[in-house]
Regions:
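A short glycine-threonine-serine/GTX helix/turn-capping micro-motif
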Residues: 356, 372-384, 537
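Cofactor-centric catalytic regions
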Residues: 1-33, 40, 49, 165, ...
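Glycine-centered tight turns that cap/initiate beta-strands
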Residues: 76-79, 252, 318, 517
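Flexible, low-hydrophobicity surface segments
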Residues: 1-171, 196-199
Length: 661
């Protein structure tokens, strides 16, 4: 990524390059020995209470009454809460849900009430004693049906919800966001096409199924300050959203996020965490633990959005793509959360990694009475590409051009004009196509190993655009200890991807110290850790990494300025290598441990200069611009695109269905 490349050039070429080298993971020993703490491992003593949730058995219904009297009377029950206790709305982009339902349930599993008790068993018994009277409503179970004028409205009050400027809901419908792309003139381009294909594809909702279920523990002290421990990809977003909904200041809301046992997007934003906090507010002083069952994981927290996609594309006789028209109907579920933004991501990526002069795309996020949707690996790209790449194969066949060659003709090159009107940054996509085709000997055919089997080869391209807001920022700090070891503060989360190790490598390389001198301050704690937007969108190495490098360079600059003053030299003549400051002019050297906390003496015993070295850094992509809501055109829609090509050879047993890659 060009931004990381720029900062890397700022690192001294005399410093051993730790980037690209295999190093031991910082969290490896903890995890293989069982010493690492995940949310469910945390101990809170005998005062811990356990929470369970009363959930709707219906996909769509009005709530006529909730009777909690029997639950409250059960011995061992310490609190029962309902939506009447918490009237505020919550949502990342569109605030369309209450913490607990107040007047209507919108999916099977919608939370109605919460119980805190001295054991999980008693809490479960209390939940069963809560009596709810419903007025059943017709559910919306398909996004296409949800678009019909006679479909029931999942959110009749859509026009009253708070929404960010770049999300465009349509009150009076089930459309929570409509994103458009209008590049060129697709309507008039079809008559110029030598071949046209049209296809419809459907992708269902999918559960993430991380090994670790969702766990949250909340405690409210006597002053009203809230602490939340949880398996979270978004501790700062949780602090912001929950505090806002509950009407407390962010300084009174603290989120501590230990290691996460798999997230894949399901632990981003706010799902079940607000439930634990709401219940804890009714039993101040005592921690309340909510741990979801595997059954709850499947229908009460985020799932991947479903998609009904219509694709139409055409090319000229030489195989050059001329036009593309897409209609995406995303199954956003009962509440939008990330779904509305995924609609945008798919919209401004709707041509796939191909240059098409004429594109018309309408991407809709549609309310249904299905589970709430959120981010899952790829953020709308796998669903969209599943249909688009099959269409590319079909169009190549229709024009009698090899599928790999067809892709090489049309794939994005450096400088290509994208569907938003911006230019493609440097990309090696054409070379990727050639390399994967060569790797599987594309064009050759090998016979199957047995008569009942069939063998085939396939190729596909991909691209992905992060759909984060243009002002999603990162920050970091670097503190040098007395022995010159380094404590690195970051707000991004370690969810198994190796982030802490990568950040340590970048900090060590930028500062000029050995990798094993670096320790990352963990767990992430919003009270002490520097701000990080979220651990999503494959963004940490790029965004948080830039903040880390800037913090390390800031510390490095302080050290060199200090030594330059003491030695009466220019900082440009100094370097830090292997934990020592060296002068290329006088050939003097000095260990960092001798200066980074206590400084250096002035000549002739006239006092000291320097002091504790703490570097600060931040990063925000200031160059992302808005898009025209009617055309989707703009100067730069996203921070960067990731591109790639894949090829595979498979053998399928036609009798058993077994697939070998």
């Amino acid at each position: 990524v060009e931004e990381v490349m720029v900062t890397k050039e700022m690192i001294s070429d005399k410093t051993p390059d730790l980037i690209g080298q295999s190093v031991p993971r910082l969290d490896a020993r903890e995890k293989v020995t069982g010493a690492a703490h995940f949310a469910d491992d945390l101990q809170f003593g005998p005062g811990l209470l356990y929470a369970r949730i009363k959930r709707s058995p219906h996909p769509h219904a009005n709530i006529k009454s909730i009777d909690t009297s029997k639950a409250k009377a059960l011995p061992g029950v310490k609190a029962v809460v309902t939506g009447e206790d918490f009237p505020g709305f919550i949502g990342l982009y569109l605030s369309d849900r209450h913490i607990f339902c107040r007047d209507r349930v919108r999916y099977v599993g919608d939370p109605l009430a919460g119980v805190a008790a001295v054991s999980e068993e008693i809490a479960e018994q209390a939940v069963e004693l809560i009596e709810v009277e419903y007025e059943l409503l017709e559910p919306v179970l398909d996004p296409e049906y949800g678009l019909r004028s006679d479909a029931p409205l999942v959110h009749p009050n859509l026009g009253e919800y708070e929404v960010v400027p770049f999300i465009l809901p349509r009150p009076g419908t089930n459309i929570s966001n409509h994103f458009k792309i209008r590049k060129g003139d697709a309507d008039s381009a079809w008559e110029k096409c030598a071949a046209i294909v049209e296809r419809r594809y459907r992708v269902p909702q999918v559960q993430h199924v991380p090994i670790e279920p969702h766990v949250a523990v909340a405690q409210v002290d006597g002053t009203g300050k809230v602490t939340l421990w949880g398996s979270s990809q978004s501790p700062f977003a949780q602090r912001n959203l929950i505090a806002k909904t509950l009407g407390i200041s962010q300084s009174d809301m603290r989120v501590i996020a230990p290691y996460v046992g798999g997230g894949f997007g399901s632990k981003a934003g706010v799902s079940m965490e607000a439930l634990a906090v709401a219940i804890a507010m009714k039993v101040k002083g005592r921690p309340v633990k909510l741990r979801l069952t595997r059954e709850e994981e499947f229908f009460t927290v985020f799932v991947r959005q479903g998609l009904v996609g219509y694709f139409k594309m055409g090319c000229d006789e030489g195989g050059r793509l001329l036009a593309m028209e897409n209609k995406f109907y995303w199954d956003g579920g009962a509440y939008t959360e990330y779904g509305v933004n995924m609609t945008r991501a798919a919209g401004y990526s709707s041509s796939g990694p191909y240059e098409v002069p004429n594109v018309k795309t309408d991407s809709y996020c549609v309310y249904t009475n299905h589970p709430v949707t959120g981010p899952m690996r790829g953020f709308g790209m796998p669903e969209m590409h599943a249909g688009l790449e099959q269409c590319i194969d079909d169009l190549a066949e229709a024009i009698s051009i090899d599928p790999a060659e067809f892709r090489k003709i049309n794939c994005l090159k450096t400088g290509s004009i994208l569907v938003t009107g911006s230019q493609m940054h440097p990309t090696g996509l054409p070379q990727c196509v050639e390399e994967v085709a060569q790797a599987i000997e594309w064009g050759s055919k090998d016979p199957p190993s047995e008569p009942t089997k069939r063998r085939g080869k396939g190729i596909a391209l991909m691209w992905k655009a992060p759909a984060m807001p243009p002002n999603a920022g990162s920050s970091a700090w670097v503190e040098l200890n007395e022995d010159a070891t380094l404590t690195l503060g970051v707000g991004g989360q370690e969810i198994g991807q190796g982030t802490f190790t990568v950040m340590a490598q970048m900090a060590a390389a930028a500062l000029g110290v050995p990798y094993d001198w670096v320790r990352v301050a963990a767990p992430v704690d919003t009270q002490y850790s520097p701000y990080e937007w979220q651990t999503v969108a494959s963004r940490l190495t790029w965004s948080m990494g830039n903040a880390v490098v800037n913090a390390a360079l800031d510390a490095r600059g302080q050290v060199l300025d200090l030594v330059a003053e003491a030695w009466d030299e220019n900082p440009e003549d100094l370097d830090i290598v292997g934990g020592e400051v060296i002068s290329y002019k006088s050939e003097e050297s000095l260990s960092l441990k001798d200066i980074v906390v206590y400084g250096l003496p002035k000549p002739n015993d006239r006092g000291w200069i320097g002091g504790p070295i703490v570097g600060r850094g931040n990063f925000m992509p200031t160059y992302v611009t808005g898009l025209d809501p009617e055309t989707g055109q703009g100067e730069r829609a996203v921070v960067h695109y990731t591109t790639g090509a894949q090829a595979v050879e498979v053998e399928v047993d036609m009798e058993t269905g077994k697939v070998e890659v």
